[in-house]
Amino acid sequence: MLKGEKVVLAYSGGLDTSVIIPWLKENYECEIIAACINVGQGEELKYIKDKALASGASKVYIEDVKEEFVKDYIFPTLKAGAVYEGKYLLGTSMARPLIAKKLVEIAHKEGAKAIAHGATGKGNDQVRFEVSIHALDPSIKIIAPWRIWDLKSREDEIDYAKKKGIPIPVTKEKIYSVDNNLWHVSHEGGDLEDPWNEPKSDLYDIITPPDKAPDKPEYVLIEFEKGIPVKVNGKALEPVKLIEELNAIAGRNGVGIADLVENRLVGMKSRGVYETPAGTLLYAAHKELEYLVLDKETMRFKDLVSQKYADLVYNGLWFSPLKAALDAFVEETQKNVTGVVRLKLYKGNVINAGVKSPYSLYNQEFVTFGKDEVYNQKDAEGFINLFGLSLKIKALMEMERKDMDEAVGR
């Protein structure tokens, strides 16, 4: 047991972690250190310290890690081009290993023997938190109340919170599970659990619904240096400010909504609606620049790496040796990913409107349909003969066997 010991709780101020504080104190008789890791939740953090203390925590940490989140988690994943199942830009998945890292640091500082989290027994986050924590310190005990307590639903949690006098931002009428950070906002649960239900127009927090976006397109220029975005519309911005600026630009144009029925690591499908405005622009721009500067073989192989990278991040294997090895490969591919991309935004759509780079592999003189002096079209005949030689030999051999069969009357 942990009677009298310190337990660090990954505290968000939401429904799950709000009821965990009194539950842990009741069942473990332990001291609760609430740790809120700020990855860009915004207004959610305004009263979080007072709320945690009122709920029974003895101490509260609020760690601002937004810059680290962007530099060490978002940008590497962006450079890798990692997208899970074609839509999900990994906003929650990237944040969890960073949160786990900070929880371990706080546990070491406080001399805590255990870390608790509010992830459910049906979701991916329990895996991400626990695998990451044990990759950093395998001696730390982990408590996952959702897997052991008698509260079987969010309705039960609401009733428990009311019984304990804990203020919560959720009602039984609006019961979405929301994860919010600098990179995205995710919505799950409630009426979204039926894939046939269209998301309600008031669901979105940071994106204007496309049908309500401006009737005129807006252009945005994004400049990259070695795969990292550094300027927006010609203005150099620090990483966090850059994401915030692109969130505003894309959001007002209805850009960045992804509605996905995804395959969870634990074996079931789930439906999530994601708002990732800045991420949608950055991924689109980064890919257009790679089309211009990467050679064919590197680009094709990087597509394979991107998928594996996405799986590793989604599955909670951020601190794995394979992910580190893939980072080294990705870093090599980004040496020439420098240039400017112009995007046209219109009612939820992102359209490439121009790209340029000092490392461009595109040569207009070679591909022009007009007169040129660098490409002899007669050379194509020899190339075609060699390129198709294996098929030609196969056809000749089949014809020869057919003639032999006919000669012997087969």
UniProtKB/Swiss-Prot annotation:
Its EC number is 6.3.4.5. Pathway: Amino-acid biosynthesis; L-arginine biosynthesis; L-arginine from L-ornithine and carbamoyl phosphate: step 2/3. It is found in: Cytoplasm. Keywords: Amino-acid biosynthesis, Arginine biosynthesis, ATP-binding, Cytoplasm, Ligase, Nucleotide-binding. It comes from the Bacteria. L-aspartate binds at residues 120, 124-125. It catalyses: L-citrulline + L-aspartate + ATP = 2-(N(omega)-L-arginino)succinate + AMP + diphosphate + H(+). GO terms for cellular component: cytoplasm. One of its GO terms (biological process) is urea cycle. GO terms for molecular function: argininosuccinate synthase activity; ATP binding. InterPro entries: Arginosuc_syn_C, Arginosuc_syn_N, Arginosuc_synth, Arginosuc_synth_CS, Arginosuc_synth_type_1_subfam, AS_cat/multimer_dom_body, Rossmann-like_a/b/a_fold. ATP binds at residues 10-18, 118. PROSITE patterns: ARGININOSUCCIN_SYN_1, ARGININOSUCCIN_SYN_2. L-citrulline binds at residues 88, 93, 124, 128, 177, 186, 262, 274. HAMAP family: Arg_succ_synth_type1. Belongs to the argininosuccinate synthase family. Type 1 subfamily. Homotetramer. This is Argininosuccinate synthase. It comes from Thermoanaerobacter sp. (strain X514).
